[in-house]
A protein has these predicted regions:
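Hydrophobic targeting segments
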Residues: 5-11, 26, 36-40
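Short, well-formed alpha-helical segments that are part of the catalytic scaffolds
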Residues: 15-29
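A conserved acidic beta->alpha catalytic loop
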Residues: 39-50, 67, 99
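Glycine-rich, basic loop-to-helix element that forms the pyrophosphate-binding segment
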Residues: 65-85
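Short beta-strand-to-loop acidic/aromatic patch adjacent to the donor-nucleotide binding site
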Residues: 88-100
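Acidic/His-rich active-site region of diverse nucleotide-sugar glycosyltransferases
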Residues: 100-102, 108-190, 195
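A short, conserved alpha-helix in the catalytic core of glycosyltransferases
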Residues: 173-182, 186-191, 195-223
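Non-catalytic, C-terminal membrane-associated alpha-helical segments of glycosyltransferases
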Residues: 237-245, 255-316
Length: 316
């Protein structure tokens, strides 16, 4: 990497201890001398918070929130800390606290970014291929395309075996933020994520920078193990952010897209009423629609507090 600039790694942490193993691994890999950690303590309990604080040092900054403000706010704070502490950096690596990189994850991202930028300066991001926690040969996604009208992502190479796909770098609408190398120049021109707590923040940014003439890629040369999101097992409060943020994203593309998002939620609520499955999610979607109309955004705690327990049993 030209000039041996530092490579900040932003890791938001909420309730997980995986970060300690991740930091140890990255301190021993190829770019160890350049890696700088920005750990976001996202309102953790006192014991974990104290352990996170102990990571502070020459190569690590710890930013603490008094409460869980969500992944969006954590990554925003991490990007702001990067600008303050490592202003010379050209790239920033976003890494979820439950993502498990390997020794080649970061080198492959950097090498792919450098190769692409040498040919085209307007490369906004390069994402890792996400592989299954149950079978590391099975691809979950290698970036994705996204339809704002359908409100649906179409993951690349999903379900394929990694050895069968081989080493490829492909153009995508967005790549998952669980392991994403971001070009600081794109952030300076296009801005960073909006604070929407969780979900659709990385998708919206990927679509936004694309509209502004930047390009996003994903590569199978870089892999990361990450748990797959299962909407069936998610707490009802998650539905609030799925609905609220899909409406927010759809609103950037016009009334037809918003109408489509509202209709999808109508069908979900109707199915819940008819079958009795996930009926507790209905008031969260209703709150999401009311908040979208009023321009209100909430944290997880605020969402749960706003929905009466009689309407949302098991919401926590």
């Amino acid at each position: 990497m030209q000039g041996k600039q530092s490579i900040p790694v932003v890791i938001p942490v909420f309730g997980r201890e995986d970060v300690f193993g991740t930091v140890a691994l990255l301190r021993s890999q190829e770019y160890a001398a350049q890696v700088r950690f920005i750990v976001i303590d996202n309102g953790n309990e006192a014991e974990l918070s104290a352990r996170l604080a102990s990571l502070s040092g020459e190569d690590c900054r710890v930013v603490r929130f008094d409460e869980n403000l969500g992944g969006s706010a954590a990554y925003i704070a991490g990007m702001e800390a990067t600008r303050r502490c490592f202003s010379e950096s050209r790239y920033v690596w976003l890494l979820d606290d439950d993502a498990k990189p390997n020794a080649e994850t970061l080198p492959a991202l950097v090498e792919t970014m450098e190769r692409l930028v040498a040919e085209d300066s307007r490369i906004a991001s390069v994402g890792s291929t996400v592989v299954s926690a149950r079978n590391s040969d099975r691809i979950v996604e290698c970036g994705a395309s996204f339809s704002p009208l359908l409100g649906h992502a179409f993951p690349k190479f999903s379900g394929h075996r990694l050895p069968d796909v081989g080493k490829q770098t492909i153009r995508v609408d967005y790549a998952a933020a669980c392991s994403l190398l971001v070009n600081v120049a794109a952030v300076e021109e296009c801005g960073f994520w909006e604070d929407v707590f969780i979900h659709f923040d990385d998708i919206e940014w990927g679509l936004r920078v694309t509209k502004m003439g930047w390009r996003n890629y994903a590569t199978t040369a870089s892999t990361v193990v990450h748990p797959e999101f299962d909407p069936e097992k998610a707490g009802p409060w998650v539905c609030y952010f799925d609905s609220r943020n899909m409406l927010w994203l759809a609103s950037k593309y016009g009334p037809l897209h918003v109408a489509a998002a509202k209709f999808k939620d109508f069908l979900k609520n109707l199915r819940a009423q008819l079958t009795g499955r996930h009926r507790e999610r209905i008031p969260y979607r209703q709150l999401a629609h009311a908040d979208f109309k009023a321009g209100i955004r909430r944290t997880r705690a605020e969402v749960i507090a706003a929905v009466p327990r009689t309407c949302a049993s098991g919401s926590e």
